[in-house]
Amino acid sequence: MKAIKYIVLILFGVISINVCAQNNNSERFAIKASAEIGLGNSISSNSYISSLSSKATTGSYGLDFGWTFWSQKGHRLEANIGVAYSPAAIELELGSFDYNYGAPATADMDGESYQRYYEISNLHQKVSLGRVTLPIYLTYGYKCNGWFGLHADLGVRFGFKTNATISEVSGEAYSYGIYPQYDNLLIDESYLNDFGTTNLANAGYGTPVCNGFSTSVLVGVGAEFSISKHLGADISVRYNRGITNLFKEQYSGQDFTNASAPINYSVSDGQQVKSLTDYLSSSKVSPLSLRIALIYRF
């Protein structure tokens, strides 16, 4: 968060220093309609479950509003603020993973407590996440000639969650129960307590627990091309370094219980699969993206 504060102070400091020197004839405004396409994996994540991995694709579609507050001999400084919708598709994979926990009487058709064992084979989840993002950034631009210029961007991006759902679940799990009170009797018959092999696509599943607010540092470089007197096109590459986590970690390193296990069972609800985002200790969206924009200057 200190990095965010320093960048914001720099942005406003530069504007304050130069605004007094601006010439009214050099004031220029811009409206920028843009689309960003994520390149490669867009999420950096960690989990205490070593076999849990994630990858994400992201995009962004929005409008930015720019104000050129200083220009001289082809150089310019521009302050920008925007609003965009930024969807993300996050895929989580839990590879071969075994665990057990103490199952209560509510997890047995005969009301017995026992030790429940799971052997998971490649549990896959896809999470759909939507955010409204507000980029605030400073642009330094240099116009090389009458129709072509280069620029660099530096700023921050704030994100606000709009929706988060698990849109897809697949995989298999084998489960069985051991009953210590019956001389460690092992039961894996499917007619009792959903033991045996289960297709997880048919199980119930939870909802990702997200942070409502996220921040990232924005940097970028690009080129702007003039189409007409007021209209231009921009192609740039941007990198957003996530500062805050997208998801709230719910379980961290403790032994599994009926409440915290990735898959659990009760007689009333059947097999229930938790969102794998519950087990992410770090989940920062950090996309490298290609940005294409249409710019109207006036």
Q: Each predicted region: which residue ranges?
A:
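Short glycine/proline- and aromatic-enriched beta-strand/turn motifs that initiate or cap beta-hairpins
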Residues: 22-70, 210, 284-291, 295-298
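Residues on the lipid-exposed face of transmembrane beta-strands in outer-membrane beta-barrel proteins
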Residues: 33-37, 61-69, 83-85, 134-140, ...
